[in-house]
From Swiss-Prot:
Residues 128-268 form the SIS domain. GO terms for biological process: carbohydrate derivative metabolic process; N-acetylmuramic acid catabolic process; negative regulation of DNA-templated transcription; regulation of carbohydrate catabolic process. It comes from the Bacteria. SUPFAM superfamilies: Homeodomain-like (SSF46689), SIS domain (SSF53697). This is HTH-type transcriptional regulator MurR. The keyword Nucleotide-binding does not apply.
Length: 285
């Protein structure tokens, strides 16, 4: 039996740490060549022995055997797909009907939500919400699809009284970053965590004494190393994709949770502002 199938079949029996390992392996199967058990343990906040025991539970002698088998399964799957049809997005091919495409997209998004939520450290999330709530000024940075997620969050935070900026222009993002002060917060959204523009802004913000919060993947990256706090997102999208669909879904689940957490922290005043905002926009109709 294929290891990916074994992981899926045994999921109901996994402990908390085992579920973290399973989620990581499935989300990063295309990048496992560069992942060691030591690096993985550090990113997940668990011991290396937990990873070895997980591999043995699935029938492998150790993590190396499991990793190589998963790489082989992924490569074989790619070759099979490429031989029969054009690869349109993630697991979707040109041979798929619209019904099949809909099912695949829905499942991809469901997995992104399930796996991202499974990784939440709620004590750390509460701390991040408190840090944001006390910030005199908040800058949100992102590129492409991540910028859209950031813009949505900025609108939500403005609605409940926060001073926020989320500029699309990277030069403006950099300019704002260097003007941040101690106590200010920069929320950097980047799934790869390696975009030069976002990393540059995070470096500038940190240098100025601002708190950097990264919404990024589990993969080790320059942004992850720079951030004071990280909020992990998981996406089942393969290296080849036509658009960041499930990635945006995962990122939105994090930003929506931040927003609701901030509303809850100051519920009476926040709800008053939301109601006033609704009343004003109704008058524009």
């Amino acid at each position: 039996m294929l290891y990916l199938t074994k992981i899926r079949n045994a999921e109901s029996e996994f402990t908390g740490n085992e579920q973290k390992i399973a989620d990581f392996l499935r989300a990063n199967v295309s990048e496992l060549k560069s992942v060691s058990s030591r690096k993985m343990a550090k990113q997940l906040g668990i011991s290396q022995s937990s990873i070895v025991k997980f591999a043995q539970k699935l029938g492998a002698q150790g993590f190396t055997e499991l990793r190589m088998a998963l790489i082989g399964e992924y490569s074989a799957s790619r070759e099979k797909t490429n031989a029969t049809a054009l690869h349109l997005h993630s697991s979707i091919t040109s041979d798929d009907s619209l019904e099949v495409i809909a099912r695949k997209l829905n499942r991809e998004k469901e997995l992104a939500l399930e796996q991202t939520c499974a990784l939440f450290d709620y004590a750390r999330l509460q701390k991040i919400i408190e840090v944001i709530s006390k910030a005199p000024f908040i800058q949100i940075t992102g590129l492409g699809g991540s910028a859209l997620v950031g813009r949505d969050l900025s609108f939500k935070l403005m609605k409940i009284g926060y001073r926020v900026t989320c500029e699309a222009d990277t030069h403006v993002q950099a300019t704002v970053s260097q003007a941040l002060k101690k106590g200010d917060v920069q929320i950097a959204i980047s799934y790869s965590g390696s975009k030069k523009e976002i990393v540059l802004c995070a470096e500038a913000a940190r240098k100025q004494g601002a708190t950097v919060i990264a919404i990024t993947s589990l993969t080790d990256s320059p942004l992850r190393r720079l951030a004071h706090y990280t909020l992990d997102t998981v996406s089942g999208e393969t290296e080849w994709r036509s658009s960041s669909m499930s990635t945006r879904t995962a990122q939105n689940s994090v930003t929506d949770l931040l927003f609701v957490g901030l509303v809850q922290l100051n519920d009476v005043e926040s709800l008053k502002m939301i109601e006033r905002s609704s009343e004003l926009t109704q008058r524009l109709k």
